[in-house]
Amino acid sequence: MASFVTEVLAHSGSLEKEDLGTRISRLTRRVEEIKGEVCNMISKKYSEFLPTMQSAQALVTQVDTLSNDIDQLKSRIETEVCRDLHISTVEFTNLKQRLERDSVVLNLLKQLQEFSSAIEEYNSALAEKKYIPAARLLEEAQECLKLLKSKKCFDLKMLKSLSMELTVQKQNILYHLGEDWQKLVVWKFPPSKDTSSLESCLQTELHLCTEQPEKEMTPLPSISSVLLAFSILGELPTKLKSFGQMLLKYILKPLVTCPSLHAVIERQPNSVSICFQSLATDSEHPPPPEAFAKIQLVLEVLQKQLLDLPLDADLEIGKVPEIVLAEMLGEVIWEDLSDCLIRNCLVYSIPTNSSKLQQYEEIIQSTEEFEKSLKEMRFLKGDTTDLLKYARNINSHFANKKCQDVIVAARHLMTSEIHNTVKIGPDCEETLPDLPSPDADHRLQVQVCKVQFTDAGNLEPETSLDPRSFSLPTCRISEAVKKLMELAYQTLLEATTSSDQCAVQLFYSVRNIFHLFHDVVPTYHKENLQKLPQLAAIHHNNCMYIAHHLLTLGHQFRSRLTPILCDGTTTFVDLVPGFRRLGTECFLAQMRTQKGELLERLSSARSFANMDDEENYSAASKAVRQVLHQLKRLGIVWQDVLPVNIYCKAMGTLLNTVIAEMIGRITALEDISTEDGDRLYSLCKTVMDEGPQVFAPLSDENKNKKYQEEVPVYVSKWMPFKELMIMLQASLQEIGDRWADGKGPLATAFPSSEVKALIRALFQNTERRAAALAKIK
């Protein structure tokens, strides 16, 4: 630095080195002299106490002069030296920048040289199938290229060429690695590659090459070197994902979905093969322990032969990062594999009966052992997987499956044929399951109130209710509905021995059965219920049968179900009105249909007018015959189907409709000749004689006579109809006698206006008729 300042001063031309040195030396000596004089003066002043005032002032003047000289010299040095120093600094900065640019260029050239060397060495290693060194050299070339790209001053065209070269070389090594991978890991597929058929699965094979094949002329690298090279190049996840998907599709999933399929491991001197064989079995789905064992066998072979291979020492360069191939493959296949095991194996192992739940512990244990073995092989990490969670949550799955099976079975029964019937009634044996007696702890405690009587007499009622008072009357119901009710009882019985959660689900599943019936049956069988009167009657009975059981169904199980359900919710009574209404509305709709058909047939009778005309009489007679035929047909269709009381009311209502229509038409006639009256009487006599025959609720004719004799009870217009027949054949005197001043049977049957109208229609206008009309008041 001193030489640099000297050089600057030498070039300045304003100050010479020798001159400065001389003057500085002189100043130094002068300073020393003055210092000595000052010390001497102080000594004299304070030590010797001599008057030295004048000498001191002179010395002060000399010091001030010397200080001024020093300041001037310093200012001159700073001015001239700083100016020349600034000029030199700029030159030095320029030189430094040039040096930095040269260093950058030199560094870029060095990176280019390293890139070129790496590519050359890579080509040599690739030619010798030393994939790991080749991959590492390619990685070094990649790093060199990244450094070159980070320098903005580098030629973009050259960078593009280098990038393209690197891409080509990477694809080249990947191609060679892929070729050797296909030789080391060989798949053999059937022509169709169809995994759904057993024949195709039996033709699928996987071969893992462990040593150099004799037929192979060129040496093959080891599987470990290929996998490590893939890892260095960043392609290992992609390769393992592709392998894992094929493993799932062609080996693991077929083993789970096909119970007869088993894996066979064949070991050759230079390879290990995984193929299939079929063993006869009656199972539609493999038991979980068997499926786990088949999967574990395949994964053990893969873990030993493919995923846990040592790296060749002569191929390693530096530290090799730990690669857990089994863990990587496990991440690829486990989610789909566990889902497949759940859907095709564990789901079907769920017991259908709560008594078998205890046996399911074996399956839970086998699932735990299966996961433990996979963790030991490092296919799985430490967390509990969905497979084991599913197996342990057996109570919930059992309840869900049981409820699903119940609803499916119920819907199948609801959509089955209605006309397949069974007879029920007080005398028929029920096949509903017997309920166990409640334990002593569950018995209902009845509080007995003690009442004191003054006179302790016999408190029993004189008359008692018939034992059948609360029984469902004898009728026929669908066999499917009887099975449906049995299913409801069995499900509730199952709930009594189940866990709280399961019991609640089963109870509400039974309620859902009846809600489903209310929605499905009227919709699914709508057309048949509208067209076929027998099915409408059976459906009516079905609804009444269900409502009858719902009245006491909850009460029967209240003391046996879990306490959660014993707070008043264990009931089905709220469903009873809906079922009664459902059955009644369906049957009433059928009754309206039958009424419409009867009235339509009677409309062809031409209002029963002009019966002396053969054509009119024939039409009326035909209409009456058709109506009676329809009623008899309905009587046969509903025979032994409807309860007797419902049957008689229904037939009585329809017959009453016919009779009321005939009465209305006849009483509306304005003129009835003698011949007309005779023929009208004949038509009415036909109805009167054959009408009771439609009352045949039972198949035994002898038992039906009772109901045929009680026709007036069910047909309100029966007695007026008989009075009408009498009037058609009676004289004015007889009519007057039957009126009996408004107290006779005729007055009970008809109002006076209708009686007068009939008299006017039947008899000519004479004094006798006028007298008779006068009596009708």
Swiss-Prot record:
Q: Does the keyword Cell cycle apply?
A: yes
What name does the UniProt record give this protein? Centromere/kinetochore protein zw10 homolog
Taxonomic lineage of the native organism: Eukaryota, Metazoa, Chordata, Craniata, Vertebrata
Sites of Phosphoserine modification: S3, S12
Location within or outside the cell: Cytoplasm; Endoplasmic reticulum membrane; Chromosome, Centromere, Kinetochore; Cytoplasm, Cytoskeleton, Spindle
One BP annotation, GO: Golgi organization
Record-stated family: Belongs to the ZW10 family.
* Organism expressing this protein natively: Rattus norvegicus
Task: Outline what the protein does.
Answer: Essential component of the mitotic checkpoint, which prevents cells from prematurely exiting mitosis. Required for the assembly of the dynein-dynactin and MAD1-MAD2 complexes onto kinetochores. Its function related to the spindle assembly machinery is proposed to depend on its association in the mitotic RZZ complex. Involved in regulation of membrane traffic between the Golgi and the endoplasmic reticulum (ER); the function is proposed to depend on its association in the interphase NRZ complex which is believed to play a role in SNARE assembly at the ER.
- N6-acetyllysine occurs at K775
Entry-linked Pfam families: ZW10_C (PF20666), ZW10_C2 (PF22766), Zw10_middle (PF20665), Zw10_N (PF06248)
Q: Which residues carry this modification: N-acetylalanine?
A: A2
